[in-house]
Amino acid sequence: MEKKIHESLVRSICLLLGIFVVVGSVRAHSYEDKDDRSNVKADTVLTYLDSPTGKLYMYYAKGRKIQNNPAVVFFFGGGWNSGSPKQFELQAKYLAEYGITVVLADYRTKNNAGTTPKEALMDAKAAMRFLKKNAVSLRIDPEKILASGGSAGGHLAAATAFCDNINHPEDDLSVSPVPKALILFNPVVDNGPEGYGFNRVRDYYEDFSPMHNIKKNAPPTIFFLGTEDNIISVETARKFKEKMKTVGGARCDPFLYPGQKHGFFNSQHKEYFEKTMVETVAFLKSLGYIND
């Protein structure tokens, strides 16, 4: 108990001082992306686009209000090439127990639709707009919809907040896709010449890269990263935090996990799944989306 109190105090002080929080010490292995959607178990499945991947897998908030619940939308990782909503199924069930409605968004990838990263972002923004337009019937508060994701899915979550110029051609642009907060798991936030995936998005990276589009009134953000991540560097996280502060005027809480690799937070790595979810709940409580 004394150790936990000490760790909590150190974490709070670090955040107040704008310092990275560093937690844990054991390595984890990367998430192995899966394209299988047949075993995603949700309370209901919605269609937001008329396509095989235009689906939203919804998990209802448990034991709280029957309407106007906060919602978190998760986007799976896989380099815009592969992946499945299944990746975040246990995170969805975890947050639902705290009165959060959770949505696992499917979207087009290279493997399932032969598309580019741009189409993935189009779908992500269409999903956010669909939820906002239909929030009342889904018992969601349209002013309390957050976005989350891992790796390329973290990029999509962040890009729904910052990247205004890429939209699905069928979107109602009068509906904002911008989430109220971001929960990012080793996210791809820099697609510039020194960032991830530049060769695939070079023709439109300035409209596609979250780092290059941060603006005032950015949503508060929590950012999880392993120090041994071979895709997202600690320096990238530092730059993102600094730009969120100086340009976005927003809170950005980075948590670094020593020795951890890309995908360390996934549910098969029980220790770090739990650690990141505990911090996620604390973040949501601090913003008033979860009550004690």
Label for each model-derived stretch:
Residues N68-G78:
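Short beta-strand element of the alpha/beta-hydrolase
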Residues H29-K65:
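N-terminal cap/lid segment of alpha/beta-hydrolase-fold proteins
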Residues G79-G83, Q87, V102, F130:
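Serine-hydrolase catalytic-loop signature spanning alpha/beta hydrolases and amidase-signature enzymes
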